[in-house]
Amino acid sequence: METNNDKIIAFKYEYRNYQKRALKEIDKYVDDNKIHIVAAPGAGKTILALKLVFDFNVNTLILVPTIAIREQWVERMLNDFTNIDKKQISTSLKELKKFNIISYQALYEYDKEEIKKIIKKNNIHTIVLDEAHHLRNAWWKLLSQVFEELKNIKIISLTATPPYDDEKNFEKYIGLCGEIDAQINIPELVGEKNLCPHQDFIYLNVPTKEQEKQINEYRVNSIKIIKWLNNNQSIIKAIATHKFIIDYKNNIDDIITNYNIFIIMLKFLNDRNIFVNQYIKDVNKSYSPMKICDYENFFKYLLYTNDKEFEIIESTLKELKSMLLQVGAIDNGNIDLLYNKEIEKELSQNIGKLNSINTIIEHEYNNLKEKLKLVVVTDFIKDDYSDFDDSEINQLGVMPIFRNITQNLKSLKICVLTGSTIIIPTDTVQIFMDICKNNNIKDENIVVNEIGNDFKYSRIQLRNNSLIVKIITELFKKSDISVLIGTVALIGEGWDAPFVNTLIMASSISSYVTSNQIRGRAIRIDKNNISKEANIWHLVCLEKCGNRYVKGKDYEKIEKRFNAIEGLALTENKLVSNINRFDYFDRSLVYEDISRINNIMLEESSKRELISKRWFIALEKYIPNNKLLIKKENILKNKKLIYKKCQPFVSYRSNRYSCIRTFTNSFLDSTFIHFECRSHSKNNYKY
């Protein structure tokens, strides 16, 4: 406990069970001076960090991403802990005290040497990094340099969303924040009633005929390139005579560093019945023939890795690159033989998703009636669809979705909230004006223009735009508006609307950080509705393969979105992570299957009360999942496997390779652990 003039600073309330568990876990890892806490929104990360800060009893610098969050820290200190002297709290770098809460932006105005001087001069010994997932670019670089040169400083890192799915940045992130010491997961918060029970649903769509044609043409061109490679004698010879193949004993370091490429070479030669030494042939026994992802990885290695072994076929590689560029298979150094950017965009913006949104909204309204508070989140505004005319809607975006709903579900009231466009039902304008008045916005600063043929909706403009999100959110809550449509950019981190009970993610976002932030908007506890259960909908466009539909690029994004999210299985009383909570996507489907699955999703979404009960049944058997421990175990296990597979020409216990630091986590994570195809859908294409 920290004492303030002989008075004990203590938390005023009782810690929740998951907070007690986290504090016990943290106690084991304080010695390395890096404490890393990962906790879902609502877990009380701030309280945990303040407990540590007061226990350490030293001058502290707390870094936060926004002014609003800065004020929340001050509020937590003063309201939730006893015996805090307000005079010891500062929010200015120019006047540091014992407890200092500063924005990252304010710190970034100084260079590395100036920051070091500030820290030393003010005897700072603890630094807290709030919302640490923000620290992957310029801020990360600056702080990494500062911390590298300053010793004996404790770093406490807090986040709800580590960049698990971004291998390159995750390594940097862990380098700065340290390995994860304590993790509080969403199910624990539901169990303590800090988050509401919820369920994810997937609604399926199929490509248009034009999209099918576009994909097939692209695949035909990719097959031609693969066949060209398979029959190119200069490339075959270069691989067969590569040092990895003919002189493996003297190239163990390079083989382990490029282990996936080594395996691809073996598979390539094996597919051509080309003999290789029996020792290294044994390494390849368990691997299947070349797949699309193998060709993609190998093409990237050939074109963008400075491997002197392939300099002899430089002209051939130029020809390969030219062919790939011609079909649009290269994007920023990455190679995709199944899709290009244009096709990927077409699928994620599939026009069928507009009708899916209507179906979901109509279904949810029929179940909840006036209690429905549904948010549709999408990527783009598409202002060119703002006119209320009869023009065809063939894109996905805020305005196309708004127009499509108002045309087909006319009884529902909708509002639009983006940085540039605010639209509300005309009959809610008076409520809107009253809310503005309560926020000290004068009438002369508000412009209201009725729009549409029947003037049922009005476009709003405010001179003080900083309050618009707060005001529209309050309007959404207080009025009979059932649906709000907005962009990811605006309805993301920090948007607080606990009354929202349904979310449609009509976005192509796949990253764990962003998608988890958006999901978090819907699963917050509503104090005015203690029985709240939230439904979260994800839209997927499948891909046609012959007469059946299979997972494709759009599905890959949703699969990635689910990878680090624990939730309730669709029909079983158990909590699982990743997309395996659904039982329907482990095989190809016919069109009738798609309709059947969509109907099952709609039917299950109607059982909100049952979903809540099932959550608490599942929680009785729940064991918190610590992703860090899993990652550590995988790394060690796969290190040993690599050595084992490379025997007899290297021993895992040899002095040369005994130091675990010889191999970086990023190498192991990006090669061996994830060596298989990046999606199960790729297994449908073998050449």
Mark where each language-model region is:
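Conserved pre-motif I regulatory segment
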Residues: 2-38
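Conserved RecA-like ASCE ATPase "motif II neighborhood" in helicase/translocase motors
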Residues: 100-128, 135-145
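Conserved helix-turn-beta segment of the N-terminal RecA-like "Helicase ATP-binding" lobe
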Residues: 60, 67-93, 174-177
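Walker A/P-loop
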Residues: 31-52
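Post-DEXD/H (motif II) to motif III coupling segment of the RecA-like Helicase ATP-binding lobe
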Residues: 137-195
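Conserved C-terminal RecA-like helicase domain
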Residues: 40-43, 47, 82-88, 93-100, ...
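Long, largely alpha-helical accessory region at the distal end of helicase-like NTP-driven motors
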Residues: 229-275, 552-687
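Conserved RecA-like P-loop NTPase helicase motor core
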Residues: 388-391, 404-578
